[in-house]
């Protein structure tokens, strides 16, 4: 026997005591608040690591992940036992519903909340409702807790850095979190009842095991009964010569509570080489003896038997792996604990798991009369009671890679669809991100407007966002009906058309406007506006004149107790001696005294309501860019006011690419976007012309710096540019290639998740949100009763 195994067996040897109560079955002797457990003679510590997008990665990325994971395995300490665990945990239905459903408020919106909640429940029922959590547990023999803590501190830092290289976040679990894992497994269906307070426990003289153990454990030869649940533990008995990297994914892809664990015992390389050399020497000796016997029988041409030749070949390959390919010898035990409500269900699930193993040419077997030992081995406690070791190299062990696909299920998150791979709900809380900037990208008909409206509906209906303001720049007149239906008296829909009654003052400026000098910022805005009006652009002389006049207009208006307007600016321009000032004044004439004076005089729109839609559909294509610019400036004023009041603002800007058609408007909008972020706003840009966006350095920088991007179906040229800018693989980009409406990719922080989002058509919300002719309610139409 290898020295490492001999030493480990000696260390793990415990005196067996007959358990007198259920608590005695749990092999943890003592716990510390930092999450260190004493299990037998060993100290153990558990770390939780997040999933990464392995299944949807390209072949090159998969190889890179595989090699990085191999490095992690190679870094494991040979003096400790490492356990990698995948925990399929069913979400508690009551907790789940509380976390995702909107509470009713007793107002007219409850009908819409009911529709939205029913949609969420239908999706949740269709989803498997299983949360997959992944842990790595280190167990080591140390003299005392101080030595153990020092060891775990060093090993933990090493693990965190290795997982970070994979793109996975690794965090250590404290005692409460580790006990919760055990409680949720032992007492399934009672997850919400877990309460653990170490101080109270000691005060009452209780054991920590009292808070996690099942009501009873019945032992049978091939299954256990934990309280009212049935449990069976299997182990991997026989391995195939070649195993695919998706075996672990398929084994754990069950809509059931289960624990899959791999116990790893690394062997020091010098010891491993010595062992393999001894084995090879034994094989060579056997071959020599066989040949000597053949020669004695005058059989000088005999061929060495196949099994001996195979042993020699495999031993040489193994030795070569250890000495020249930086592989390590590992001993591994794989256990799988599955649970069910009935014995029949347990038998059915067992057969399903066995068939998955057979598909991969492996053999899983049920542990006979060792079920309790198997359970303690499968759980992330740090115990190992099963000795069904298999000798593997680092590479062959790395094939059992535990990664699948990233999930986004934030507490207090907003629904954005279902994960296209795991079918779990995607719940995003943008407050958790580094910045709250968002982009909705897609070709016409891909579902951009619908996605934006669905988000707006959620914000207007959910009580958590009741105090937030929503401001929408609406170039196509698509959002008014929805906002009016859900907002009623709290909503303003401003229809900005030539000669209309709704007006906006382009020169309006609140206190605190801009990042530094408000006059300079407003001057920049006016330059952008004139550039939109006069396509010849704004030269250096024009800029000087505009800057001078803007600085003069505001103090004069303030003295007379009025609000400065574009009419005042035009008048001031006419007073200037330069001819170019007269040119600028002439450009502004149409917007001040002409037929398009809706931005030249004092505002008539009620901007104090929480929900405001700026509908510029009637402006025409020529004037929309200027209208979008004025609206952005108006929104910036409102965001600044809300920021001072401690209020959050959600900003939606459709046809976003228009802002970057000219240099000055691009500079102004880049500054405005930056201020949105700094002043507590959640800006969302919506566009179908991704190519225009990416041609602008400023716009592409804004896009790449955004933490939240929803990519729906993309045109071929846009796909290539997006993939390059956001570093997305071809496999991942396939989800935005000829995708159905409402399907695509979400980039959420560092996560990249394919999603499917389909809303039920037989609802009033759908009629308010869809833009399909004949199905939806649009700006000028009657809202359904």
Q: Whereabouts are the PLM-identified features?
A:
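Conserved lysine of the Walker
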Residues: 448
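Extended, folded cores of ATP/NTP-driven motor/assembly subunits in large transport
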Residues: 1-402
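Hydrophobic positions on the alpha1 helix immediately C-terminal to the Walker A/P-loop
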Residues: 451
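A short helix-turn-beta junction within AAA+ P-loop NTPase domains corresponding to the substrate/partner-engaging
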Residues: 488-494, 698-711
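Hydrophobic anchor at the beta1->P-loop junction of P-loop NTPases
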Residues: 440
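P-loop NTPase motor domains
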Residues: 52, 59-78, 85, 89, ...
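The conserved Walker
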Residues: 432, 444
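Post-Walker A helix-loop "phosphate-sensing" segment adjacent to the P-loop in P-loop NTPases
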Residues: 458-471, 489-491
């Amino acid at each position: 026997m290898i020295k490492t195994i001999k030493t480990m067996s000696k260390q793990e040897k415990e005196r067996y005591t007959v358990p007198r109560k259920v608590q005695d079955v749990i092999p943890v002797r003592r716990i510390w608040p930092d999450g260190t457990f004493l299990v037998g003679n060993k100290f153990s510590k558990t770390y939780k690591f997040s999933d990464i997008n392995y299944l949807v990665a390209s072949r090159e990325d998969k190889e890179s992940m595989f090699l990085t994971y191999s490095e992690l395995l190679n870094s494991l300490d040979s003096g400790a036992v490492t356990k990698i665990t995948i925990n399929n945990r069913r979400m508690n239905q009551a907790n789940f519903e509380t976390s995702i459903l909107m509470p009713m408020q007793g107002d007219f919106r409850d009908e819409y909340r009911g529709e939205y909640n029913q949609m969420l429940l239908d999706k949740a029922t269709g989803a498997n409702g299983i949360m997959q959590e992944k842990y790595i547990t280190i167990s080591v023999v140390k003299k005392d807790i101080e030595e153990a803590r020092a060891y775990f501190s060093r090993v933990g830092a090493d693990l965190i850095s290795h997982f970070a290289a994979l793109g996975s976040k690794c965090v250590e679990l404290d005692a409460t979190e580790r006990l919760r894992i055990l409680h949720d497994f032992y007492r399934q269906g009672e997850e919400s009842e877990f309460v653990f307070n170490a101080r109270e426990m000691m005060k009452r003289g209780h054991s920590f095991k009292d808070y996690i153990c099942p009501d009873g454990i019945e032992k049978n030869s091939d299954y256990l009964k934990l309280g009212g649940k049935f449990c069976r533990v299997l182990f991997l008995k026989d391995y195939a010569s070649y195993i695919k990297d998706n075996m672990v994914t398929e084994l754990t892809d069950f809509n059931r509570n289960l624990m899959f664990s791999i116990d790893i015992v690394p062997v020091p390389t010098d010891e491993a080489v010595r062992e393999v050399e001894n084995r090879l020497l034994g094989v060579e000796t056997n071959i020599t003896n066989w040949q000597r016997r053949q020669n004695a029988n005058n059989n000088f041409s005999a061929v060495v038997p196949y099994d001996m030749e195979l042993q020699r070949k495999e031993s040489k390959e193994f030795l070569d792996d250890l000495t020249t390919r930086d592989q390590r010898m590992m001993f591994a035990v794989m256990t799988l604990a599955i649970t069910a409500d009935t014995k029949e269900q347990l038998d059915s699930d067992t057969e399903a798991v066995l068939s998955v193993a057979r598909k991969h040419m492996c053999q899983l077997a049920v542990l006979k009369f060792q079920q309790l030992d198997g359970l303690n081995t499968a759980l992330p406690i740090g115990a190992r009671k099963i000795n069904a070791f298999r000798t593997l190299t680092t590479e062959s062990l790395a094939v059992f890679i535990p990664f699948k696909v990233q999930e986004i299920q934030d507490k207090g998150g907003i629904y954005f669809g279902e994960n296209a791979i795991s079918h779990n709900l995607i719940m995003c809380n943008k407050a958790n991100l580094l910045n709250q900037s968002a982009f909705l990208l897609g070709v016409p008909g891909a579902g951009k407007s619908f996605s934006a409206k669905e988000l707006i509906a959620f914000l207007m209906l959910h009580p958590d966002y009741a105090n937030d303001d929503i401001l929408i720049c609406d170039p196509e007149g698509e959002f008014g009906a929805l906002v009016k239906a859900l907002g009623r008296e709290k909503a303003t829909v401003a229809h900005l058309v030539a000669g209309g009654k709704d007006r906006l003052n382009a020169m309006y400026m609140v206190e605190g406007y801009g990042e530094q000098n408000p006059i300079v910022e407003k001057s920049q805005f006016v330059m952008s506006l004139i550039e939109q009006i006069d396509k010849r652009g704004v030269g250096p002389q024009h800029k000087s004149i505009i800057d001078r006049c803007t600085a003069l207009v505001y103090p004069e208006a303030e003295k007379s107790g009025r609000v400065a307007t574009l009419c005042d600016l035009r008048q001031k321009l006419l007073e200037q001696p330069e001819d170019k000032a007269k040119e600028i004044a002439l450009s502004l004439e149409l917007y001040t005294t002409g037929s398009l004076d809706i931005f030249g005089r004092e505002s008539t729109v009620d901007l104090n309501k929480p929900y405001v839609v700026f509908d510029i559909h009637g402006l025409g294509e020529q004037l929309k860019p200027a209208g979008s610019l004025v609206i952005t400036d108006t929104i910036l004023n409102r965001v600044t006011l809300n920021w001072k009041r401690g209020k959050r603002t959600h900003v939606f800007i459709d046809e976003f690419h228009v802002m970057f058609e000219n240099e000055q408007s691009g500079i102004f909008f880049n500054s405005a976007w930056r201020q949105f972020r700094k002043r507590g706003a959640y800006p969302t840009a919506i566009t179908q012309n991704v190519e225009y966006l990416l041609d602008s350095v400023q716009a592409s920088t804004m896009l790449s710096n955004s933490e939240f991007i929803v990519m729906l179906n993309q045109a071929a040229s846009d796909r290539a540019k997006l993939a390059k800018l956001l570093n997305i693989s071809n496999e991942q980009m396939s989800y935005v290639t000829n995708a159905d409406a409402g399907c695509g990719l979400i980039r959420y922080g560092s996560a990249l998740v394919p999603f499917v989002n389909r809303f039920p058509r037989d609802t009033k919300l759908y009629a308010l949100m869809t833009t399909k002719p004949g199905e939806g309610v649009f700006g000028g139409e009657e809202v359904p009763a």
